[in-house]
Amino acid sequence: VGEVHFAPGTVARVRTIDYFDGSGNLTLREQYDIRGFKTADEFFGQDGQMHYQALYRPDQTKYMERYYVKSTENTPINSLNRLINYQGHDYYFDTIDDLFTFFLDQLNNSTAEDNTFIADRPAMANNPVMDMMTPAKKLLWLPINHVAEGNDPVAGVLSGVYQQALNRDNIGRLDGLIVMTAQQKADLKKRFKRQIKIYQVSGGIAATGEPVPMAQRQSNRIIHVGRLGFDKQIDQVIQVFQGIHDQIPTATLTLYGYGEGADVAKFEEQVKNAGLEGLVTFAGYLPDTSSVYENAQLYLDCARIDGQPLSLVEALGHGVPALAYDYPYGPSDLITNGKNGYLIAPNTPTKMIQTAVKLLKNPARLQKMSAQAYELSRAVDAQHVWKQWQTIIKG
């Protein structure tokens, strides 16, 4: 028996085909690329867990085999990876990190240039980049806070994903760290002193389109863009909007982005209990949000912690004044208080409500802040961000 699953958002394009034995147990899953060719065979045991995987090229030649053993929790653990007939030889790797490092070294050797490798996914890329055997410039990009929430950024315990990479024995294997904000750069320089170079490069690039006047936007339209989770304190965004709506009945809130189903359900229940149905919209994920920003008059950010919120860069770049809690890291680098938005003390929704109402009731002030949002965003436009990268590439 075979069960065909189609790729979301397509018409009859196969994503997977599952095969079952006579007892209804999954035995084989074929994975397909959206372009129409098979990419993998995955074989399952009687316990329902994968034990072997074969990977294929577009011409259907097999290039890799991956083997799995059972953990104490009865989940599959990758125990061996076989790279088949690479330059006439088979190679065996105990872990995917070892395979990743091998790939990076092969890539590095494929050119005669002085190459730079940047690990930008801490859990996946830090160790493979640091373990490279061939000479190259190696840097880590820190997309999140380097310490756990609530810890001192200079002396506190490092976040788990950085404890190995940034310990005393390993940090000397790196040529630098890249962060997105001046505040985090300053904290890391205090922490590591002269042990390693710290670079700052904006993670977001502001748009450079024609300004859209506030009068052409939907009146009192408030937005938030990003992952919908309790760490982002979407519950407080809704709470703040409720306070705004009590004083400005025409105000609306639209939330763009995805989240865990259970979390989103709780936010929807909060909206229902507050009597805000029809005023708060969960719009889901959009690949292009330019029109969203250009029709909004105010952006709210009630998060506890972040690296540099991309949506805040985008909102300001589209002339949307922003109110954000002054958390580490991001808002204080992007918002000049009273110019393009306001920094609000964390977890003070009443203060954010008061600030938002005062601003929305003053169209002239709102328009001035929008113009300043466009102007100040030039500091993170494509030209300026490219100059930041040049200090790393040429340094």
Task: Describe the role of every protein-language-model region.
Residues 336-338, 342-349, 357-364:
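Conserved acidic donor-binding segment of nucleotide-sugar-dependent glycosyltransferases
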Residues 250, 292, 351, 358, ...:
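A short, well-ordered alpha-helix in the C-terminal region of glycosyltransferases
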Residues 321-325:
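Short hydrophobic beta-strand element within catalytic cores of glycosyltransferases
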Residues 264-284:
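Nucleotide-activated donor-binding/catalytic signature segment of Leloir-type glycosyltransferases, i.e.
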Residues 225, 253-265:
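Glycosyltransferase donor-sugar binding loop
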Residues 285, 304:
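Aromatic "clamp/platform" in nucleotide-sugar-dependent glycosyltransferases that forms part
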Residues 220, 224-243:
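A conserved mid-protein helix/loop that constitutes part of the nucleotide-sugar donor-binding site
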Residues 160-196:
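A short, active-site helix/loop in glycosyltransferases that binds the activated sugar's phosphate group
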